[in-house]
């Protein structure tokens, strides 16, 4: 749809302008025109960088791409503690409460919208686009989530990757003959690193793992809310894995 690369890397040449033509019918718009309530929550990386200011144009913002409701951030990433949030087209300040985290906030917003929609228009189906900022950088997660993985990666990445592929083979996640890809030359052998590097890199791995588990937890809250409103058996989940884990 005229976007040959991510929006920030568009060139202006045909097929790579970073601008979805208005002649293209977005999925959400097709569903909305056929009676769906539509909401987008979290990350929206579908708008060219020069169209993301409060001055617009807003043609490629979620609410002009078929979504009745949008709560989230525009672009590839945001601070999870102090995010740059938009409610539809309006810049809003994150709630001022202790322990605030955007993934929790966007999940609360998604659940609230879904329950309100079902309360007001129970006869209408809904389509929700739920895209967390995780686990894209910045890797911001409450300490208690990261601390759950204390010591899990102390053996270092050379050993951990071997243990991981062995576990995946035994669980049937990958074929038994699957071999590890060669390690990139730029990644040093774990045993050649200093003690400070060991501490830094193991903590980074703990934070990443905690960030991922926290995200799983929030997705679980959303799924539980769908079950609470009695729509689990009539809901289709489409999971799309991104490029950041």
Show the residue positions of the predicted features.
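Formylglycine-dependent sulfatase
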Residues: 1-245
């Amino acid at each position: 749809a005229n976007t040959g690369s991510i929006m920030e890397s568009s060139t202006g040449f045909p097929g790579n302008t970073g601008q979805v033509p208005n002649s293209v019918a977005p999925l959400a718009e097709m569903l909305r025109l056929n009676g769906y309530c539509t909401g987008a929550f979290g990350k929206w990386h579908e708008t060219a960088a020069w169209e993301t200011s409060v001055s617009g144009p807003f043609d490629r913002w979620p609410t002009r791409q078929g979504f009745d409701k949008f709560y989230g951030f525009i672009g590839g990433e945001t601070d999870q503690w102090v995010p740059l949030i938009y409610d539809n087209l309006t810049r809003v300040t994150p709630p001022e409460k202790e322990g605030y985290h955007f993934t929790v906030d966007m999940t609360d917003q998604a659940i609230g919208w879904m329950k309100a929609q079902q309360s007001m228009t129970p006869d209408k189906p809904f389509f929700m686009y739920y895209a967390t900022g995780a686990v894209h950088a910045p890797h911001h997660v409450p300490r208690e989530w990261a601390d759950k993985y204390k010591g899990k990666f102390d053996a270092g990445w050379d050993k951990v990757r071997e243990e991981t592929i062995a576990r995946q083979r035994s669980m049937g996640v990958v074929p038994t003959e699957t071999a590890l890809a060669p390690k990139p030359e730029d990644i040093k052998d774990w045993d050649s690193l200093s003690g400070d590097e060991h501490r830094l890199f193991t903590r980074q791995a703990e934070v990443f793992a905690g960030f991922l588990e926290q995200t799983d937890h929030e997705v679980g809250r959303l799924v539980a809310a769908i079950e609470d409103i009695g729509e689990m058996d009539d809901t289709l989940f489409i999971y799309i894995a991104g490029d950041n884990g």
